[in-house]
């Protein structure tokens, strides 16, 4: 347990909320079961960002699902990371792809998908979806299949 506490700098400590996009707050820890294929899912119902053109707030539920390999994302760091989008100007599709790419850089998962369920503005709701499967593996094929059969 001491080793795990040394790996993580946010959990169990006073929280500083970043006011702009801050991928550096993401932290990972070792997966105790990298030989197993299993889902880890996060549902983040209070995501906010800003429209890069109007500066108006956008609200969404962000859903993150992944098959971990050696590393896993620590949930408090993920919460703080997602909060850092609060004053960040980005289109919905950009937010989803940025989140996915940052998590790939952090963990190098076998497979990951991120969905944004954005609250309607102007009578239109946008639900961007992005996924990734590790190249050259069955997870790459899985990503293609899931993308082609998405909704």
Curated annotation (Swiss-Prot):
Pfam families with a match to the protein in the record: QueF
Enzyme class: oxidoreductase
Pathway(s) where this gene product acts: tRNA modification; tRNA-queuosine biosynthesis
Disulfide linkage: none
InterPro entries (alphabetical): GTP-CH-I_C/QueF, NADPH_dep_7-cyano-7-deazaG_red, QueF, QueF_type1
Gene3D superfamilies xrefs: 3.30.1130.10
Compartment(s): Cytoplasm
Keywords: Cytoplasm, NADP, Oxidoreductase, Queuosine biosynthesis
Active site: 51 (thioimide intermediate), 58 (proton donor)
Residues holding substrate: 73-75, 92-93
Catalytic activity entry: 7-aminomethyl-7-carbaguanine + 2 NADP(+) = 7-cyano-7-deazaguanine + 2 NADPH + 3 H(+)
Entry function: Catalyzes the NADPH-dependent reduction of 7-cyano-7-deazaguanine (preQ0) to 7-aminomethyl-7-deazaguanine (preQ1).
Family matches, as NCBIfam families: QueF-II (TIGR03139)
Protein name: NADPH-dependent 7-cyano-7-deazaguanine reductase
Record organism: Bacteroides fragilis (strain ATCC 25285 / DSM 2151 / CCUG 4856 / JCM 11019 / LMG 10263 / NCTC 9343 / Onslow / VPI 2553 / EN-2)
Gene: queF
């Amino acid at each position: 347990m001491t080793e795990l506490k040394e790996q993580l700098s946010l959990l169990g400590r006073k929280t500083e909320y970043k006011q702009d996009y801050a991928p550096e707050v993401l932290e990972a820890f070792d997966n105790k079961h990298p030989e197993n294929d299993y889902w880890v899912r996060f549902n983040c119902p209070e995501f906010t960002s800003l429209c890069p053109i109007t500066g108006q707030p956008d609200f969404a539920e962000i859903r993150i699902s992944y098959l971990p390999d050696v590393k896993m994302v620590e949930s408090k760091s993920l919460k703080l990371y997602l909060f850092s989008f609060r004053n960040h100007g980005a289109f919905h599709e950009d937010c989803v792809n940025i989140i996915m790419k940052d998590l790939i850089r952090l963990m190098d998962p076998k497979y990951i998908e991120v969905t944004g369920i954005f609250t309607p503005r102007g009578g239109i709701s946008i639900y961007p979806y992005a996924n990734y499967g590790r190249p050259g593996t069955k997870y790459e094929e899985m990503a293609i299949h899931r993308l082609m059969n998405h909704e």
